[in-house]
Amino acid sequence: KTLDISAISFHKMLQVAKKQDAIAEGGSVVALTYVASQRTFFGYNDMADAKSMLESIARGFGYIYGREKNVRINTISQSPTPTTAGKGIKDMENLMDFAGKMSPLGNASAEECADYCVVMFSDLTRKVTMQNLFHDGGFSSMGMSLRAMNQYAKDLAPYEDENGKVIYG
């Protein structure tokens, strides 16, 4: 169900829009994704697969639409943001807190993401297509912040799951 809702529906929407010639010449389509499509995040699981597929669909249709109608199709990789879909992510609140602390600019809010989408729909980005654009306060470019290094240095004891199995990483 996750793949259907978070990826295949995007493909179907673009496919129908193309058949019905529903997107204007020079138009713009934007879908939201998350860095877990390219990195490993505990608890993200199926949603990470769906977001990877979503980004691939955007690139594929971006080429077709770009050549045929000068339409731009991009994805925006947003900071962890409280959403209905996000409620299914294990420890979402901890992920949001961690990302906010790791990001030099902090997490981008839903309102800031909406502003970024408006820019992507404008003619200011008429040559931007088939891209996954990060809107995450710098989180996607971070390796390890000083704050995280200091915290980890205090306690690097093994982490055990509910069955007592040690989890590394």
Question: Where do the PLM segments sit?
Answer:
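Short beta-loop-alpha junction of Rossmann-like oxidoreductase domains
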Residues: 79-91, 143-144
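Catalytic loop of short-chain dehydrogenase/reductase
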Residues: 1, 23-67, 78-82, 106
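Non-catalytic terminal and boundary segments that flank Rossmann-like NAD(P)-dependent oxidoreductase
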Residues: 20, 26, 146-169
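Structural signature of the Rossmann-like NAD(P)-dependent dehydrogenase/reductase core
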Residues: 6, 27-34, 72-77, 129, ...
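Glycine-rich NAD(P)-binding loop of the Rossmann-fold in SDR/ketoreductase-type enzymes
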Residues: 1-9
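A short helix-coil junction within the Rossmann-fold of NAD(P)-dependent oxidoreductases
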Residues: 12-26, 64-68, 123
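C-terminal helical subdomain
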Residues: 8, 12, 75, 93-128, ...
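Residues immediately C-terminal
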Residues: 140
